[in-house]
C-alpha cells in the first residue's frame, strides 16, 4: 500500500460519461491542447474543492481520474490514467482518515477482505483507493430469490473465512450483513468484505462490547436483552447465521415490518427451516443461530463444518431446489442502523 501526497486538479467538462474510453479520449484532448499543464503533485496553483461537483467536472488526483459518485459524496468511480484500470475511491477528511482506517492497518491481508491499493493525501482530504467490485451479496440474493446449496456453500465459506480472519486478528465487525460483502469478479464466484470501517479493535482477548451497533434484521438476542456487555464475536456469528439462512431460504429468519415485533421474534430465537434444505445445512444454521451466545459455533468452527465438504452433485438431488416461493428479502427495509430504535 502506497501513501503519498498530491494536489487534486479539477478538469471542466460538460456532462458525464460512464464510458472510460470516452473519459480517456477527453483527458487526452485536454492534455494535448495544454502541453504545458503539469499533473505532478508539486503543482503550484490553488487547490480546487476536494470533492467537486462531478456533474460538471472530473477531478484528477495523482495518477487517477475521479468520475461520478457511487455512494453519497464520498465514494467515487475512479480510473487509472495510464492502465485504464477501474477502481473505487473513498474520500475522508484528512484529520480522521487514520482513525477510520485503523482496523485496515492492524489486520494482515486476506483474499476475502477488500484491500487498500493506494492512499493519496490532499490538503484537506485523503483519497483511499480500492479495487472495483461487481455488485453486493444482498442484491445478488434478491435477484436469485435464493441460492442452491452448492453455490451458497462456496460463497458463505468465503464470507465466514473473512470474519474468522478478523476475529483472529482482534477485530469485531459489529455491522455484518449481506450488503457488506461484494463480488470480486463478474462471474460472481468470489466475494470479499467491502470495508472494515465499522469494526472495533479489541484490546486483548476480551471481546466484550456494550454498544448496540448493527442492523435490526441481523442483530442478536443478547444485544436486545441486555443493558450491559455482550460477546462481540458471538454477535458477529449470529449475523453470519442470518446471512446463511437468507442465502438458502430467500428471506430473513426473523422478519416483521414493525421493529418492536421483529425484536420480540429475535429475542425468542424461534425460526422455521424449510424441509427442502439438506440435513447438514439445517445443522449448520441451528448451530449458529442459537439463542445462547456460548452455545454458538465460533467463526473458525463454522469453517470446519461438514456441510462445506458435501458432494453436492449427489446430495442436491432432493434438497435446495429453486422452487417458486415468495421472496421476502427487502431492498432496504430492516437494513437501517439500530440507533434510532434505542435513542
Curated annotation (Swiss-Prot):
Lipid metabolism keyword on record: no
Intrachain disulfide bonds: none
Tissue occurrence: Expressed in granulosa cells of the dominant follicles of the ovary and down-regulated in ovulatory follicles.
CDD domains (UniProt xref): PK_TRB2
Keyword Cytoplasm: yes
Subcellular location: Cytoplasm; Cytoplasm, Cytoskeleton
Family of the protein in this entry: Belongs to the protein kinase superfamily. CAMK Ser/Thr protein kinase family. Tribbles subfamily.
Name by which UniProt lists this protein: Tribbles homolog 2
